[in-house]
Regions:
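Start-transfer (signal-anchor) and selected internal transmembrane alpha helices
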Residues: 1-97, 276-285
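Transmembrane-helix motifs of polytopic, lipid-linked glycan transferases
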Residues: 162-183, 221, 410-414
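Membrane-proximal stem/loop segments at transmembrane-domain junctions that anchor or position
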Residues: 297-385
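Extracytoplasmic catalytic/substrate-binding loops of multi-pass membrane glycan-assembly enzymes
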Residues: 102-118, 122-146, 154, 158, ...
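Loop-to-helix entry region of an early transmembrane alpha helix in multi-pass inner-membrane enzymes
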Residues: 137, 141-145, 153-170, 190, ...
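Transmembrane-helix signature of polytopic, membrane-embedded enzymes
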Residues: 175-198, 424-428
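Membrane-interface anchor segments at the N-terminal boundary of transmembrane helices
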Residues: 43-53, 159, 370-437
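Multi-pass, polyprenyl lipid-linked donor-dependent membrane glycosyltransferases
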Residues: 138, 159-167, 191-226, 249-256, ...
Length: 469
């Protein structure tokens, strides 16, 4: 008993030293971020997101470590259920009041697209006919479809906000349940749920667009399904369904799914698991194909179907920044082409290729490096490479860009089953993380908010390894 106590004290002392080191690294790192922000190298949102994640993660670990004695006390299932329901109800009421009475601070691009598209559709004849935006970003159109449906159902965007707030609260509870499944500690799960609710309330009217709210539930749902008690076959089928649905709502849902497969790679090396793996990927393909068919039918009903015969100039016109109140990245003056309802292929090739080159020249040295790194990685994010779709090799670039990403992810997953050395395995994870970041590019700042549950779960796992035996 004494030896065990001595080991625990030694572990606590080690944890204290590590926490002090983290604090020493944390403050200069944040100062560096804000200096870079003031110099224009990074966006304000990047600093806020990184700062919030580090602060909340370190704060969570510290609180759990500080109150570990009370946290380790058993908690009845009845009290646990009541506590989670209480957190859910109180947070939902508070966030609903915020949605109803606080002015909207972050206008979603998709809402602006919808409103402006309806407005411009009234004078469709003067709009340039492009078919870029929703051809290249079909998953974003899913957001427009969902928001449009909710808007028609409730009659205002307040109703849309309340529905997305409900999804955020459900995500928080799932984060708590997942933490309980991993750590086996109900008190830790309640703490995680509360912290997640506090963070989501802070972000509700500032840095969390509707698309993130709608997509947030899927990553944590995948983790919850994986950690819950269920037969392995049913588990992978449910995960495949969650990934398929989440992919249509928010494409980045696929990232935690791949991460989960990689982290669990050692467990899937055995031959008897091949059946489960095959069933899982087959289910994912079936669900994805079915949802893709349904999705295309919905787009046809909404007259957003995209092929060589149908144009959506007003949608693209807004997406590229004309009359865009957000002041987003697509702020190009389209007046040159506005008087040509049907510009030739040569006209738009020259115009947008020239704009892309001009944009690169105007960027700083750091910006150019990031641009070319993104170009090499064929990232999907909000970079100027998107405008290169209009050059004569647009289809080739699109195919290379997409399939390079899928090929890289496939190789990473396959590597999971081959590499057994932990050092190389962690290197593989690091490479995967870099590719994932380049894939998200500058848009990744706000998408990181979707993965706060994953951060909390990992924090819970660390606590379990350190203190809970």
């Amino acid at each position: 008993m004494k030896q065990r106590t001595d080991r625990l004290i030694l572990r606590m002392n080690t944890m204290t030293r590590k926490f002090s080191i983290l604090q020493m690294i944390f403050i200069p790192l944040m100062l560096l971020f804000f200096i870079c922000m003031n110099m224009g190298f990074v966006k304000y949102n990047d600093c806020v997101v990184v700062y919030s994640i580090l602060l909340l993660t370190i704060g969570t670990i510290f609180c759990i470590w500080k109150f570990k004695d009370s946290i380790n006390k058993p908690l009845s299932q009845k009290t646990y259920s009541k506590s989670l329901w209480g957190v859910f109800i109180v947070s939902f009421v508070i966030q609903t009041l915020v949605c109803m009475y606080v002015p909207l601070a972050y206008y979603s691009d998709f809402i602006i697209v919808r409103e402006q598209a309806i407005h411009m559709a009234e004078d469709y004849s003067v709009m340039p006919q492009y078919d870029f935006y929703f051809h290249s970003y079909p998953y974003q159109l899913s957001i427009v479809v969902i928001i449009n449906f909710l808007y028609e159902l409730f009659g205002s965007y307040k109703g849309v906000e309340i529905v997305t707030t409900l999804l955020v609260n459900i995500s928080a509870i799932l984060a708590g349940l997942t933490t309980c499944n991993i750590t086996g500690n109900r008190r830790v799960a309640i703490v995680v749920a509360i912290l997640f609710e506090v963070f989501s309330t802070f972000c509700l009217k500032t840095y969390m667009p509707y698309s993130a709210n709608l997509g947030m539930i899927f990553p944590i749902l995948i983790l919850y399904i994986y950690t819950t008690r269920m037969s392995r076959i049913w588990k992978v089928v449910c995960i495949a369904l969650a990934v398929a649905v989440g992919y249509r709502v928010k494409m980045t849902t696929i990232i935690p799914f791949i991460a989960m497969v990689m982290f669990c790679g050692y467990k899937l090396l055995r031959e008897r698991d091949l059946k489960t793996l095959i069933v899982g990927f087959a289910s994912l393909m079936i669900f994805s194909y079915a949802l893709s068919s349904i999705h295309n039918c919905m787009l046809e009903k909404m007259h957003f179907v995209n092929d060589e015969k149908i144009d959506h100039g007003f949608i693209y016109y807004v997406a590229m920044g004309q009359n865009n109140p957000t002041g987003g990245q697509y702020n190009h003056d389209l007046s040159v082409l506005a008087d040509r309802p049907f510009p030739s292929k040569k006209d738009r090739d020259e115009y947008f290729l020239g704009k892309a080159i001009q944009s690169v020249k105007e960027r700083s040295a750091i910006g150019q490096l990031k641009f070319f790194a993104a170009k090499i990685a064929f990232c999907w994010g909000e970079t100027y490479i998107d405008h290169l779709y209009f050059c004569k090799y647009d289809k080739v670039l699109l195919i290379i860009k997409h399939y390079t990403w899928y090929l890289a992810m496939t190789l990473m997953v396959i590597g999971t089953f081959i590499i057994r050395d932990r050092r190389y395995y962690m290197l593989l994870l690091g490479i995967w993380g870099v590719i994932a970041y380049l894939y998200l590019s500058e848009a990744g700042a706000r998408y990181v908010l979707m993965y706060m549950p994953l951060v909390y779960v990992m924090a819970g796992w660390v606590v379990k390894r350190l203190f809970i035996r």
